């Protein structure tokens, strides 16, 4: 019997082997693992993704039953601790039946089916030699053995909201869209085959944001360029593995030695390789439901629900008679009849007439008089600024952009007018990245008084002349959310040679997120476009817009239940400029001394154009 691999010392990162679809060829797989372990080891674990059991129905020699049975019955030994997720194949239910029946309780770290061999069943998160590992076993399908369920998916969605970085995410199938945004001209031709891709996996990885995503089922080896997800400090690396013993000699075993994120420094976690791209995935807000599947046996299903219902109960959200926010706010819910919450058309009608959702759901609202929505059915339609004057002053005193606030970084200011001022962006995407900011505390430049538009126009004209001397043109964009505090219109200078590509790249980015921009004033009059934008803006709407070089505007009105990335504009322009490593402003911060020097340099060049001079 093979001994378990020794644990690494606390100062040494664990060494992990990854393998693709074994397809029942365990002798060949473990022979290769033994060879690698002897020559370049020791390795502490083997993680197998893709189909572990043979696709053949026979139990004889070469069949999945024959080789697996050798290990289950002790005729052969598994060389190092091995974990698999691909619990499907004709013989799999019979071979796993004993382990399934003897399993007691929930085993996130796997069910042992023989010494050193562990079945990762369902979905869960566990720790392996300090690494946080999340997995989804089975594959997309009509239900039953070997197919993951909606319960498994929901459990992972709940886990995604918990703190901590996931080091490894294991799935059997590739995430749909993983090759978006990269050059695939030198990649294996099989990646263009739709077989083996799964949109549900794409949603999950976009929410979980692991450091490594490992998958099988495509029959090829492919290591994608690292990418950075919205709001994630780290990059994600996708590795697809080939089948064991494939004729094309594609790589089916791969070694990694990642330091657990829990022990890494902030600098190391934020490190971005030069070939980092933006995330290839659509927004997880556009939920793709799992196909209708028969429920697991009651005991197993209860275990699955326990994993995410504990979180709901902890926060007082255990379904029952509570309203479904997604249905109440949008009129639809991807879980349909399987949703744990109430779908009430009458409540939706009240919500659409501005009755507070918490009032409808709980009979009270913790915000009390500060809430801007109605707290009785007879007061429908009320949307009001209920904050007392003292409260508004308190908000403004803690605002980053109010000039009277002690928190404002005044050393970044480059010009102050009557209604607007300009400042260099903190953590700029590119040099001379400017913010045009209302002097008064206002949540959007579109809500400023009409007379302030003239001054805004003068600032934009001045910036245009300043950037023109550098061979650049400014791209303006603004994100306006219901939670916005103080508006800032961002002006990012891009080379004139890139100007014609701005419209296309924003349309492509929108398509990736699952929405389409509407074009405001396609005739190209920038002033008229701003007028039309102001008519679209109301106090209840979240929106994003970008002003194109030719004068038209791309506008997206954001649904209340839509997860729109706050850094969308910056991320898209980072992609246009091949600066994905600078998409997050926190990666671009410099010292205060450097900021002061940048402001001085900007002022010297801008002085001749500054409308406030």
UniProtKB/Swiss-Prot annotation:
One of its GO terms (molecular function) is zinc ion binding. The keyword Metal-binding applies. A zinc finger (C3H1-type) spans 318-346, 350-378. Residues 275-296 are annotated as: Disordered. GO terms for biological process: mRNA splicing, via spliceosome. It comes from the Eukaryota. Pfam families: CwfJ_C_1 (PF04677), CwfJ_C_2 (PF04676). Keywords: DNA-binding, Metal-binding, Repeat, Zinc, Zinc-finger. GO terms for cellular component: post-mRNA release spliceosomal complex. This is Zinc finger CCCH domain-containing protein 59. It comes from Oryza sativa subsp. japonica. The lineage of its organism: Eukaryota, Viridiplantae, Streptophyta, Embryophyta, Tracheophyta.
């Amino acid at each position: 019997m093979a001994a378990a691999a020794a644990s690494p010392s606390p100062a040494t990162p664990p060494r992990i082997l990854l393998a693709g679809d074994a397809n029942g060829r365990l002798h060949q797989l473990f022979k290769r693992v033994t060879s690698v372990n002897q020559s370049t080891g020791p390795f502490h674990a083997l993680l197998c993704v893709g189909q572990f059991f043979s696709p053949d129905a026979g139990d004889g020699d070469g069949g999945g039953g024959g080789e697996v049975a050798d290990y289950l019955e002790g005729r052969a030994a598994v060389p190092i601790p091995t974990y698999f997720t691909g619990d499907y194949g004709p013989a799999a239910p019979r071979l796993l039946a004993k382990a399934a029946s003897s399993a007691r309780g929930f085993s996130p770290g796997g069910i042992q089916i023989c010494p050193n061999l562990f079945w990762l069943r369902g979905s869960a998160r566990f720790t392996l030699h300090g690494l946080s590992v999340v997995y989804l076993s089975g594959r997309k399908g009509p239900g039953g053995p070997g197919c993951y369920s909606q319960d498994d998916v929901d459990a992972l969605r709940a886990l995604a909201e918990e703190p901590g970085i996931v080091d490894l995410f294991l799935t059997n199938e590739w995430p749909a869209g993983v090759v978006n945004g990269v050059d695939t001209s030198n990649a294996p031709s099989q990646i263009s085959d739709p077989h083996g891709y799964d949109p549900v996996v794409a949603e999950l990885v976009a929410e979980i944001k692991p450091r490594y995503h490992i998958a099988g089922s495509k029959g090829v080896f492919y290591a994608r360029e690292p990418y950075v997800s919205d709001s994630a400090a780290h990059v994600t690396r996708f590795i697809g593995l080939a089948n064991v013993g494939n004729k094309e000699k594609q790589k089916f075993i791969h070694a990694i030695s990642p330091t657990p994120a829990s022990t890494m420094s902030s600098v190391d976690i934020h490190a971005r390789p030069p070939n980092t791209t933006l995330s290839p995935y659509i927004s997880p807000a556009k939920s793709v439901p799992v196909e209708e599947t028969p429920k697991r046996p009651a005991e197993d299903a209860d275990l699955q629900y326990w994993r995410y219902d504990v979180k709901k109960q902890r926060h007082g959200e255990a379904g029952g008679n509570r309203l479904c926010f997604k249905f109440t706010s949008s009129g639809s819910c991807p879980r349909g009849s399987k949703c744990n919450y109430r779908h009430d058309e009458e409540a939706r009608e009240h919500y659409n007439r501005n009755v507070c959702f918490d009032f409808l759901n709980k009979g009270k609202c913790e915000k009390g008089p500060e809430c801007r929505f109605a707290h009785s059915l007879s007061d429908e339609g009320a949307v009001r600024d209920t904050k007392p004057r003292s409260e508004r002053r308190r908000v403004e005193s803690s605002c980053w952009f109010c000039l009277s606030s002690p928190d404002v970084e005044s050393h970044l200011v480059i010009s102050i007018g009557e209604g607007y001022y300009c400042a260099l962006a903190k953590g700029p995407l590119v040099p001379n990245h400017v913010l045009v900011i209302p002097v008064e505390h206002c949540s959007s430049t579109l809500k400023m008084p009409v007379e302030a538009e003239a001054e805004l126009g003068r600032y934009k004209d001045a910036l245009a002349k300043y950037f023109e001397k550098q061979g650049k043109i400014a791209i303006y964009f603004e994100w306006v959310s219901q939670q916005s505090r103080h508006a800032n219109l961002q002006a990012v200078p891009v080379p004139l040679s890139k100007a014609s590509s701005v419209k296309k790249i924003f349309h492509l980015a929108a398509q990736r997120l699952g929405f389409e921009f509407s074009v405001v004033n396609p005739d190209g009059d920038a002033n008229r476009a701003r007028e039309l934008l102001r008519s679209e803006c109301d106090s209840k709407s979240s929106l994003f817009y970008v002003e194109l070089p030719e004068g038209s505007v791309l506008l997206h009105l954001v649904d209340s239940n839509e997860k729109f990335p706050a850094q969308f504009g910056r991320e898209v322009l980072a992609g246009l400029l091949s600066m994905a490593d600078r998409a997050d402003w926190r990666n671009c911060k410099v010292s205060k001394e450097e900021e002061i020097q940048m402001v001085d340099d900007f002022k010297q060049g801008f002085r001749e154009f500054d409308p406030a001079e």
